[in-house]
Amino acid sequence: MKTNIINTWHSFVNIPNVIVPAIEKEIRRMENGACSSFSDDDNGSLSEESENEDSFFRSNSYKRRGPSQREQHLPGTMALFNVNNSSNKDQEPKEKKKKKKEKKSKADDKNENKKDPEKKKKKEKEKEKKKKEEKTKEKKEEEKKEVVVIDPSGNTYYNWLFCITLPVMYNWTMIIARACFDELQSDYLEYWLIFDYVSDVVYLADMFVRTRTGYLEQGLLVKDRMKLIEKYKANLQFKLDVLSVIPTDLLYIKFGWNYPEIRLNRLLRISRMFEFFQRTETRTNYPNIFRISNLVMYIVIIIHWNACVYYSISKAIGFGNDTWVYPDVNDPEFGRLARKYVYSLYWSTLTLTTIGETPPPVLDSEYIFVVVDFLIGVLIFATIVGNIGSMISNMNAARAEFQSRVDAIKQYMNFRNVSKDMEKRVIKWFDYLWTNKKTVDEREVLRYLPDKLRAEIAINVHLDTLKKVRIFADCEAGLLVELVLKLQPQVYSPGDYICKKGDIGREMYIIKEGKLAVVADDGITQFVVLSDGSYFGEISILNIKGSKAGNRRTANIKSIGYSDLFCLSKDDLMEALTEYPDAKTMLEEKGRQILMKDGLLDINIANMGSDPKDLEEKVTRMEGSVDLLQTRFARILAEYESMQQKLKQRLTKVEKFLKPLIETEFSALEEPGGESELTESLQD
């Protein structure tokens, strides 16, 4: 048999041309099956390419080609190659595909909704629910978790501290008393239970208030709920608060109602009482009195606890067994509850204050208790009494300092043989200052405050008074603040002259309190009486050109009684006006208008221009400044010359030091082999 061997080099030579259309159909069927998603244009282009390939093979079937070339021109491979290329070129972007999918899904939904209206309603409800859930989630995420926060420096927080202090003090005083005096617990059990559980409710409410109490972080109040809770939990007080609300009352079921000492854990909330006392001390206007009363309360509580312990020890030893313990309760006189407590309180007071005069102890346990009481009395009461003494001395410190000043002035007047009338006037003036609380030096008190707070206090106190002056009514706020800080309070006695006619005016005055009289030269005849809010001397400190009175006083002003005035000096006003030139011109214009109304302005002199005296003063000032600059320049020049001389001396020293070294190096270079030695020395 003869076998036909197919030559792979000419794979299409022995194949008849009739087989090609069948292969093309087969390839087209594969293409249509694999690429049905392509458009009709793509299919048309593929068919054109396949026809071109047929003609190409018919014309070049007998030409020699390599395997790669034959492979490229095979009908099937060529078609698939072109399909892949066209799919890569015509591939749509992802966004367009997504849009097409959305459109298809919407169209499908519409078709389904037309068919099933119930499904449509269900889908709409589901969509609404999803939208609501998304909105709530977004709100929760966007919210900063801010809640109603209590400001720790506000009145609400302070009032709550007062509310929580009451149950704390109740527990600290009554639990120990009820535990030691059985009648007190059994006779009023219903009332104690009500008070106990009301205090427990207040304790629980206090824990909630703590989680809503803000704190300052970089000067800003923190209002984040989670931060507040985390800060409270991280604090030691949270653990104490939890321990203080543990329901130990359940032990009543086992031990009975006569054991109120099981509620001793309620005493752990004492820090709230201390906080209330501290805030009250800062708020009250009488801090020394409050401190003293606070210490007295501590003393009473210590004596109360010691009295209860004494009675319980007497009960343990046996009433009336010896002279030291409480007497026999079978005696009607000592069987009453009031007598039991008062007797124990009396014994505790005598013991802790180390006064004594109590029956001596008999048993060893009694001796130990008395020794402990004496130690407590010595340590605690010594500190408490010392604090009270220091507080009382602080309360009298101002009076003592004031009295020392008065005594020093009295000694001076006696030494200088001052008349008795003058001495009486001085003493009366000091008495007026003390009784009216005008001994405080405002500058000394406000010295420790920052400038901003000091200015605000001065504005609150003096700004309204300064605005009453006509020339300052329309001035800038900044200038008024500057002037307010420069006002000086002064007090004048009855009959004192504030100013006399013809005196040079260097100050203006504003009456804060009191009455002043404009009197004649005899000092008796009164023309006008000035009262609170009046002012005078404002024109003289402006030194307006053309004033007929110049800068001298035009009237005699005398104090009728004790008068409080504010004084503003000319130098302070001019210093403030240097930063406000527009305000200066406005004040001068107002002063001219006032003088024109009163007929005290010479218009010709006012319109003459600048005064030659002022020009001379300016020239002298300029000459002085030039002289100062010359002296400074000469000093700088002398310093420069001295520095230059020192630099020259240093350079000469360096030359002397380096000259022999350089000469030796150059001499070594001139010798044969010197260069190599020099390089070796440099390398070393």
Swiss-Prot record:
UniProt name for this protein:
Cyclic nucleotide-gated channel alpha-1
Which GO MF terms are attached to this record?
calcium channel activity; cAMP binding; cGMP binding; intracellularly cAMP-activated cation channel activity; intracellularly cGMP-activated cation channel activity; sodium channel activity
PANTHER family with a match to the protein in the record: CYCLIC NUCLEOTIDE-GATED CATION CHANNEL SUBUNIT A (PTHR45638), CYCLIC NUCLEOTIDE-GATED CHANNEL ROD PHOTORECEPTOR SUBUNIT ALPHA (PTHR45638:SF9)
Q: What is known of its domains?
A: The C-terminal coiled-coil domain mediates homotrimerization of CNGA1 subunit. The cyclic nucleotide-binding domain (CNBD) comprises three helices and a beta-roll of eight beta-strands from CNGA1 and CNGB1 subunits. Upon cNMP binding transmits the conformational changes to the C-linker domain of the S6 helix to open the ion conduction pathway.
Q: Which species expresses this protein natively?
A: Mus musculus (Mouse)
| Gene designation per UniProt | Cnga1
- Glyco sites are at 321
Stored InterPro entries: CLZ_dom, CNG_cation_channel, cNMP-bd_CS, cNMP-bd_dom, cNMP-bd_dom_sf, Ion_trans_dom, RmlC-like_jellyroll
The residues that hold 3',5'-cyclic AMP are 553-554
